[in-house]
């Protein structure tokens, strides 16, 4: 295609798309945050499955109590922490704000609250282990309170990041819906 400006008309060489074809920032952010939350949900699922396995072995007495101790009380309500993760996953396909809000609220109730209770429940045993070097519950030869505190710290971090990213995703979705209402 020839023109007076030269062999090719200006703007037809493919360089004119940069000012037109851009994905809105809140859509880019939504995709990124969904991916991060999914990764955290999968890490939470691994923690949850390990906890279920430990509790099953303890209750079914598949191994002696010298190897696997009975579960702490905080572990039972923590089993419900799978509910917020499922609600979070259900909110992703259609950007369902109500499921995401339910996920965030139930995460505080079913995930964070049992972890706080667990840290308080295990504190006397951890204090005794630190001061006197005596442990009464064991998990494959290790002090159960030490192992469970490591799990607890990891779970707190996973849920805190999950809440943080969920809040940012919620803000991103609100931006998107506000722009649609203006049009």
UniProtKB/Swiss-Prot annotation:
Instruction: Please classify the protein's predominant subcellular localization into one broad category.
Output: endoplasmic reticulum
Q: What happens when the gene is disrupted?
A: Lethality around embryonic day 8.5. Mice carrying a hematopoietic lineage-specific deletion of Jagn1 show defects in neutrophil-dependent immune response to the fungal pathogen Candida albicans. Neutrophils display defects in the glycosylation of proteins involved in cell adhesion and cytotoxicity as well as impaired migration in response to Candida albicans infection and impaired formation of cytotoxic granules.
User: Which GO terms of type biological process are on file?
Assistant: defense response to fungus; endoplasmic reticulum organization; granulocyte colony-stimulating factor signaling pathway; insulin metabolic process; insulin secretion; negative regulation of insulin secretion involved in cellular response to glucose stimulus; neutrophil mediated immunity; neutrophil migration
Q: What is the residue range of the signal peptide feature?
A: none
- Tell me where it resides: Endoplasmic reticulum membrane
Membrane protein topology class: Multi-pass membrane protein
Q: Which residues lie on this side of the membrane: Cytoplasmic?
A: 1-39, 93-96, 159-183
Q: Which UniProt keywords apply?
A: Endoplasmic reticulum, Immunity, Membrane, Phosphoprotein, Protein transport, Transmembrane, Transmembrane helix, Transport
Q: Which GO terms describe its cellular component?
A: endoplasmic reticulum; endoplasmic reticulum membrane
Q: Which residues lie on this side of the membrane: Lumenal?
A: 61-71, 118-137
PANTHER family per UniProt: PROTEIN JAGUNAL HOMOLOG 1 (PTHR20955:SF1)
UniProt subunit comment? Interacts with COPA, COPB2 and COPG2.
General function of this protein: Endoplasmic reticulum transmembrane protein involved in vesicle-mediated transport, which is required for neutrophil function. Required for vesicle-mediated transport; it is however unclear whether it is involved in early secretory pathway or intracellular protein transport.
Record family assignment: Belongs to the jagunal family.
Q: What is this protein called?
A: Protein jagunal homolog 1
Task: Provide the organism lineage as a comma list.
Answer: Eukaryota, Metazoa, Chordata, Craniata, Vertebrata
């Amino acid at each position: 295609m020839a023109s007076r400006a030269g062999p090719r008309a200006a703007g037809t060489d493919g360089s004119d798309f940069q000012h037109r074809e851009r994905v809105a920032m809140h859509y880019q952010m939504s995709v990124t945050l969904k991916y991060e939350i999914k990764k955290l949900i999968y890490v939470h699922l691994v923690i949850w499955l390990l906890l279920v396995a430990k509790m099953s072995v303890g209750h079914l007495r598949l191994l002696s109590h010298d190897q696997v101790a009975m579960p702490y009380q905080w572990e039972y309500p923590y089993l419900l922490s799978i509910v917020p993760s499922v609600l979070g996953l259900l909110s992703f396909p259609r950007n369902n704000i109500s499921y995401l809000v339910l996920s965030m609220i139930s995460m505080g109730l079913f995930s964070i609250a049992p972890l706080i209770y667990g840290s308080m429940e295990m504190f006397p045993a951890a204090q005794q282990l630190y001061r006197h070097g005596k442990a009464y519950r064991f998990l494959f030869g290790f002090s159960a309170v030490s192992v469970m505190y490591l799990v607890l710290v990891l779970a707190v971090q996973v849920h805190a990041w999950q809440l943080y990213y969920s809040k940012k995703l919620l803000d991103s979705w609100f931006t998107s819906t506000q722009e649609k209402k203006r049009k």
